[in-house]
């Protein structure tokens, strides 16, 4: 026996078999050891050969295990095994068979054939009992080989390579494993048209990710199976090439090329009966390329040019431009077929076609209105992905969430069960008590417990019954789907008797049973289990994905929106017009009456410093999100240079920071529903506003990397001090129309008409009146109280102290900011000293009263001692 005459895989198997014999304590290395290792192989080549030869691989495995169990075992041996006589004869038989077939190396299939032929080996009888004859096995080997010989140590990789490195889409279509393909007739027809050409008959499907390129290939496979193709494509096989499997494990140089050549040779030998589908076609360019080696695309070019290889490619627009178009020789061998994103109406049709498969998988029903909502909401709110993929994902996740709810215990039952457990614990505690009152309580508790247990048992039974009904409907759907598949197979095979039984007997009966089961599901007036996916479920998933509140408003939220002015007025004093304008925009948006192609609202807040422009924006973020941090604040004083616009939308290609994206665009991409504040806009360079034109008009902006960012769910607020001198000069009771005209003149001089024309409303903030200062004092002190609440210190302000602070903090030219300084000077600073001196320990109540030129702090009721 010359080990060099054996292929790499056979050598590996023999090594494994020898190791196994040693581990088991067998003294002899027998054919049974070799057969066991061959049958245990992950890739299952030997098992596959046995099955194809009409044998039973499982039976062969059992027989081998039984034979090995009979072999004598030796313990404490010298750690070596001896080659048995039968195995030596098997090796000789394998070498003879290889020589006879013209092979340079003994391969796995020749070794298996020798194990079946050599009568002195126990493996011959094992394989014979499993139903394998040497003649049939030899026949199968010749079918796989197709006249090719093993002339390299890795020869096995070249045999039956399509089965290893490709999926048969037509076989999957025949078995009903592919999802139905709805619409896309034009693209499939165009693909068939290109495939039917004499030369350059290789279409490449080009489109955005998620528009259904792979689905078109599956649609072609379904058409081939149904015979709905021209004569030139009838009975062809569509095989999807798996580039990952081709590359994986190719350790040595030339191994990848050898595998790919084997695939191409097999396709060529079929005489045009195989169409190769290469998904993610751009992976061909550069695949397997190493120093001096050819990549996959160069290996394909000659076969494509000669028309020996029928190929359908699929890739995205970006990848096609980046990889395939650069290689002009490869690009010209393919004929592009553009796959456009379907419309919302087409997407609804696609979802209706897929609905049954998803209902069957999740075991819930999906309403038609949910499909319409999935298409419409995904189109409107999920802007960075494409239809129909995003709509299908929405439907899938909504059904998955509902299934989880069905499998979980209903809330009312869960509460009952917890109450029962609580009462049982109380009962055990009361049993230990001997007094009369405890015994009375125990008797009452026993009554409560028994009634609760009865209620829980009834609810559990009802829940289980509803779940069971749902399960029955799902099982019927599965049976119906299998029957329809069987009908199609019977029609294709010409088994008309079976087809008639299915079409006029089995299928109508199943449909009737399913209709009855579904009508019973909906019969309950108040079901515990929701079994239908509704538009609300879809809206909830959209809200989870994007953070945009799409789902149905609860009663509490409606009331909150109707009282929005009152809520905002708690934080912003004296600016009724501004509060109303902002509130109207939010209500319009949440009621669904907002223009879907523009931001929720865009406002310019004009007014002197310190009157509440930025404060109103913060209050709005707090109202909408219960969180001030949901505010994207951009200080325009940082954008005084022309080039600084790159910081907003991201640096262009070739500049430092290109990969990082822009401050504005990245924030809105991650959180599409937020308030964007451009503070002090008059300080920015005028060219910065050119970027905002399409945001204000179309609700979108293209960032430095060419991605479109959606601003349709943002509220854009810009603040400015322009014309503040006119507003400051305005008296308390003067007419503001003339002042407004003066302010607008200044604004028009500072900003271009096309910018101002796109803003929804320009709102003037009035200077603060003395009468409004008391309310602002309360707002500012509320913040101080929150800081003190950590130390359980309560701050109580007398009316005279409030007036004192309002007087000291009022300055018409500077708004409310001097009040902050007054509170800091007269309240925070002296209070900080007293707290540090220990005058007001934790838990104190501090009363603040006005003095002549300062505020006095006194320990209030509830304190341990008096302090002046």
Curated annotation (Swiss-Prot):
Annotated ATP 1 binding sites: 207-214
Region described as NBD2: 557-767
Location relative to the cell: Cytoplasm
Any one cellular-component term (Gene Ontology): cytoplasm
Region (Linker): 342-547
Coiled coil: 392-526
Record carries keyword Protein transport: no
Amino-acid positions noted as binding ATP 2 in the UniProt annotation, renumbered to this chain: 607-614
UniProt GO molecular function: ATP binding; ATP hydrolysis activity
InterPro entries documented for this protein: AAA+_ATPase (IPR003593), ATPase_AAA_core (IPR003959), Chaperonin_ClpB (IPR017730), Clp_ATPase_C (IPR019489), Clp_N_dom_sf (IPR036628), Clp_R_dom (IPR004176), ClpA/B (IPR001270), ClpA/B_CS1 (IPR018368)
Stretches for region C-terminal: 768-868
Repeat 1: region residues: 6-71
Protein keywords: ATP-binding, Chaperone, Coiled coil, Cytoplasm, Nucleotide-binding, Repeat, Stress response
Superkingdom per UniProt: Bacteria
Role played: Part of a stress-induced multi-chaperone system, it is involved in the recovery of the cell from heat-induced damage, in cooperation with DnaK, DnaJ and GrpE. Acts before DnaK, in the processing of protein aggregates. Protein binding stimulates the ATPase activity; ATP hydrolysis unfolds the denatured protein aggregates, which probably helps expose new hydrophobic binding sites on the surface of ClpB-bound aggregates, contributing to the solubilization and refolding of denatured protein aggregates by DnaK.
Family: Belongs to the ClpA/ClpB family.
Name of protein: Chaperone protein ClpB
């Amino acid at each position: 026996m010359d080990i060099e005459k054996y292929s790499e895989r056979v050598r590996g198997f023999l090594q494994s078999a020898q190791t196994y014999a040693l581990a088991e304590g067998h003294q002899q290395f027998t054919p049974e050891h070799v057969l066991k290792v061959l049958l245990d192989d992950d890739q299952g080549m030997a098992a596959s050969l046995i099955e194809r030869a009409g044998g039973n691989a499982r039976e062969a495995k059992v027989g081998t295990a039984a034979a090995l169990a009979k072999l004598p075992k030796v313990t404490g041996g010298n750690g070596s095994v001896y080659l048995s006589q039968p195995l030596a004869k098997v090796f000789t038989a394998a070498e003879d068979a290889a020589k006879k077939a013209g092979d340079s190396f003994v391969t796995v299939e020749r070794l298996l054939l020798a194990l079946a032929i050599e009568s002195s080996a126990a493996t011959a009888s094992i394989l014979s009992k499993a139903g394998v004859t040497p003649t049939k096995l030899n026949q199968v080997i010749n079918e796989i080989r197709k006249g090719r010989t093993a002339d390299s140590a890795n020869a096995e990789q070249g045999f039956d390579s399509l089965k290893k490195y490709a999926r048969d889409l037509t076989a999957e279509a025949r078995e009903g494993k592919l999802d139905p393909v709805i619409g896309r007739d034009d693209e499939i027809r165009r693909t068939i048209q290109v495939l039917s050409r004499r030369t350059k008959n290789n279409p490449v499907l080009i489109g955005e990710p998620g528009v259904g390129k792979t689905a078109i290939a599956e649609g072609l496979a379904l058409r081939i199976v149904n015979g709905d193709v021209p004569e030139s494509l009838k009975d062809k096989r569509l095989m999807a090439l798996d580039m990952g499997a081709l590359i994986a494990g190719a350790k040595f140089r030339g191994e990848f090329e050898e595998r790919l050549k084997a695939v191409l040779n097999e396709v060529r030998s079929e005489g045009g009966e195989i169409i190769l589908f290469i998904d993610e076609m751009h992976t061909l360019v550069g695949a397997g390329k190493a120093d001096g080696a050819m990549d996959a695309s160069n290996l394909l070019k000659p076969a494509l040019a000669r028309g020996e290889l029928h190929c359908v490619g699929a890739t995205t627009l970006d990848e096609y431009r980046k990889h395939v178009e650069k290689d002009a020789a490869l690009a010209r061998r393919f004929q592009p077929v553009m796959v456009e994103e379907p419309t919302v109406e087409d997407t609804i049709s696609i979802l209706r076609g897929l609905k049954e498969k998803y209902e069957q998988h999740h075991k819930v029903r999906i309403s038609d209105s949910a499909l319409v909502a999935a298409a419409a909401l995904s189109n409107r709110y999920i802007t960075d992905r494409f239809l129909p993929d995003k709509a299908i994902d929405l439907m899938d996740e909504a059904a998955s969430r509902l299934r989880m709810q069905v499998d979980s215990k209903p809330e009312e039952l869960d509460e009952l069960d917890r109450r029962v457990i609580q009462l049982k614990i109380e009962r055990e505690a009361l049993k230990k008590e001997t007094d009369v009152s405890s015994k009375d309580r125990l008797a009452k508790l026993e009554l409560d417990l028994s009634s609760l247990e009865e209620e829980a048992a009834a609810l559990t039974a009802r829940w289980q019954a509803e779940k069971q009904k749902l399960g029955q409907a799902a099982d019927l759907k599965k049976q119906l789907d299998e029957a329809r598949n069987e009908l199609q197979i019977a029609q294709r095979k010409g088994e008309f008797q079976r087809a008639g039984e299915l079409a006029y007997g089995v299928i109508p009966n199943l449909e009737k049973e399913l209709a009855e089961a579904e009508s019973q599901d909906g019969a309950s007036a108040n079901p515990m289990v929701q079994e239908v996916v509704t538009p609300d479920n879809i809206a909830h998933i959209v809200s989870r994905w994007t953070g945009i509140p799409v789902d149905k408003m609860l009663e509490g939220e409606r009331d909150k929106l109707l009282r929005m002015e009152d809520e905002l007025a708690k934080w912003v004093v004296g600016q009724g017009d501004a509060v109303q304008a902002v509130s109207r925009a939010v209500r319009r948006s949440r009621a669904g009456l907002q223009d879907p192609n523009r931001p929720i609202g865009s406002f310019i807040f004009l007014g002197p410093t310190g009157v509440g422009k930025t404060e109103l924006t913060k209050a709005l973020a707090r109202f909408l999100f219960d969180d001030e941090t949901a505010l994207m604040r951009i200080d325009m004083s940082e954008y005084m240079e022309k080039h600084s616009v790159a910081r907003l939308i991201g640096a262009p290609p070739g500049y430092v920071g290109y990969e990082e994206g822009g401050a504005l665009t990245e924030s809105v991409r991650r959180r599409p529903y937020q308030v964007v504040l451009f503070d002090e806009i008059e300080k920015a360079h005028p060219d910065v506003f050119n970027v905002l034109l399409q945001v204000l008009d179309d609700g979108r902006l293209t960032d430095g990397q060419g991605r479109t960012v959606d601003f349709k769910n943002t509220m854009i607020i810009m603040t400015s001090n322009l014309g503040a001198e006119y507003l400051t000069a305005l008296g308390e009771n003067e007419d503001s129309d003339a002042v407004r005209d003066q302010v607008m003149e200044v604004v028009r001089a500072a900003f271009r008409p096309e910018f101002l024309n796109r803003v929804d409303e320009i709102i003037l903030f009035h200077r603060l009146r003395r009468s409004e200062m008391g309310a602002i004092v309360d707002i500012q002190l509320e913040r101080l109280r929150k800081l003190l609440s950590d130390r359980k210190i309560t701050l109580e302000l007398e009316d005279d102290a409030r007036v004192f602070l309002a007087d000291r903090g009022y300055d018409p030219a500077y708004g409310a900011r001097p009040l902050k300084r007054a509170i800091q000077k007269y309240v925070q600073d002296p209070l900080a000293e007293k707290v540090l001196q220990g005058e007001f320990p934790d838990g104190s109540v501090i009363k603040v009263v006005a003095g002549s030129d300062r505020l006095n702090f006194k320990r209030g009721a509830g304190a341990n001692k008096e302090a002046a």
